[in-house]
């Protein structure tokens, strides 16, 4: 589809007071990305001219979205002098002959449904959806495939109250309609705001046809509260996981699994129940076992868990990570770490075995230090490696060893535990004193 046919304006200037949050509404996350991210991503799929209107927490919104997109026009609304959705359009320069106006709080909108606005004919296209219970909504009265009027519930007749069509709040206009009617908008209403919907009534009064376009309520329903946010995340999770399963990922009890938008799977992968995979994690030909957490990490040809935790910047390949093992900012290749270990700020090479209870002590209260472990190293259970430490290839660390900062040369054995003492009949003597 030709991306030059339509411009898109996304309204993202509002405070979102119903969110009851100090954070701008459009910056609230859904599956790891701000809700505004999704509608921008979808918009860029059909247009080369995308503008985002900002006002409330402008700098935070611009900074956040600039991390993902470098070709978006940010327009700052003069919310003091020109508040409202109509006021938001006053500073926008439209490149193409048609413009689609979207809301920043609609993260679930699909490209396929936006295509309908490109195909619809007419200078003004107005989105509608049908509700089983439209109570509280203004009704859209349609006759002969044309919007005849929009009537608020309090002003509707008994017959009009039976209508289930309501305004979905998305519009497509020809450029000439915007150029003609935006300067004519007035704010003589109770809120003293400039409303984009007034263009509909002005155009209709001038005999211009208003074309209705039926859209999916679940996609176009705005996210206005924390409850809406939760509902949207459930729907988005289903979309993400269904797409992954269709591409070949096996999921056990997918309703218990959480996977964020930026996660990538390649090859044959299995994800068991209760797992959480976030950030820009990449899973390649691997098995993620039950209740494991993976954050911004790469897992290749490996198995992880159950109940393992890969924190950000972990990179494992051809490796076994067992239960209750935590990895942070470390690279492991061809390694076995079966249980109850913490590996942080470390590089561990192939053939190395990490025993139960092994800890890399990487932090002295001020600075972080690296641990480097070579090939074919055997580290016994309950050992502490106090970084900075370098362990060359083919080394053995005895169980219970505390290895203090330094270097261990190839072929060496490190033992720090003293020989155990056995005191005969001590138990009986000790408790006899009680």
UniProtKB/Swiss-Prot annotation:
Catalytic positions? Answer: 339
KW Magnesium (keyword) present:
yes
UniProtKB keywords: Acyltransferase, Cell shape, Cell wall biogenesis/degradation, Cytoplasm, Magnesium, Metal-binding, Multifunctional enzyme, Nucleotidyltransferase, Peptidoglycan synthesis, Repeat, Transferase
- Claim: Acyltransferase is one of the keywords in the record: yes
The entry's free-text remark on the cofactor is: Binds 1 Mg(2+) ion per subunit.
Tell me the residue numbers annotated for binding Mg(2+).
105, 224
Q: Which Pfam families match?
A: Hexapep (PF00132), NTP_transf_3 (PF12804)
Which segments carry the region annotation N-acetyltransferase?
248-434
A GO term for molecular function: magnesium ion binding
Supply one GO CC term from the record. membrane
Pathway assigned in UniProt: Nucleotide-sugar biosynthesis; UDP-N-acetyl-alpha-D-glucosamine biosynthesis; N-acetyl-alpha-D-glucosamine 1-phosphate from alpha-D-glucosamine 6-phosphate (route II): step 2/2; Nucleotide-sugar biosynthesis; UDP-N-acetyl-alpha-D-glucosamine biosynthesis; UDP-N-acetyl-alpha-D-glucosamine from N-acetyl-alpha-D-glucosamine 1-phosphate: step 1/1; Bacterial outer membrane biogenesis; LPS lipid A biosynthesis
Q: Where is this region: Linker?
A: 227-247
What is the annotated localization of this protein? Cytoplasm
Q: Which reaction does it catalyse?
A: alpha-D-glucosamine 1-phosphate + acetyl-CoA = N-acetyl-alpha-D-glucosamine 1-phosphate + CoA + H(+); N-acetyl-alpha-D-glucosamine 1-phosphate + UTP + H(+) = UDP-N-acetyl-alpha-D-glucosamine + diphosphate
Q: Where does UDP-N-acetyl-alpha-D-glucosamine bind?
A: 11-14, 25, 77, 84-85, 138, 152, 167, 224, 311, 328, 342, 353
Q: Which InterPro entries match?
A: Bifunctional_GlmU, GlmU-like, GlmU_C_LbH, Hexapep, MobA-like_NTP_Trfase, Nucleotide-diphossugar_trans, Trimer_LpxA-like_sf
Binding-site residues for acetyl-CoA, renumbered to this chain: 356, 362-363, 381, 399
Record region (Pyrophosphorylase): 1-226
Cofactor names: Mg(2+)
Q: What does this protein do?
A: Catalyzes the last two sequential reactions in the de novo biosynthetic pathway for UDP-N-acetylglucosamine (UDP-GlcNAc). The C-terminal domain catalyzes the transfer of acetyl group from acetyl coenzyme A to glucosamine-1-phosphate (GlcN-1-P) to produce N-acetylglucosamine-1-phosphate (GlcNAc-1-P), which is converted into UDP-GlcNAc by the transfer of uridine 5-monophosphate (from uridine 5-triphosphate), a reaction catalyzed by the N-terminal domain.
Q: Which PANTHER family match?
A: BIFUNCTIONAL PROTEIN GLMU, NUCLEOTIDYL TRANSFERASE
Family to which this protein belongs: In the N-terminal section; belongs to the N-acetylglucosamine-1-phosphate uridyltransferase family. In the C-terminal section; belongs to the transferase hexapeptide repeat family.
The name under which this protein is listed is: Bifunctional protein GlmU
Organism for this UniProt entry: Sulfurimonas denitrificans (strain ATCC 33889 / DSM 1251)
The organism's taxonomy opens as: Bacteria, Pseudomonadati, Campylobacterota, Epsilonproteobacteria, Campylobacterales
Gene (name only): glmU
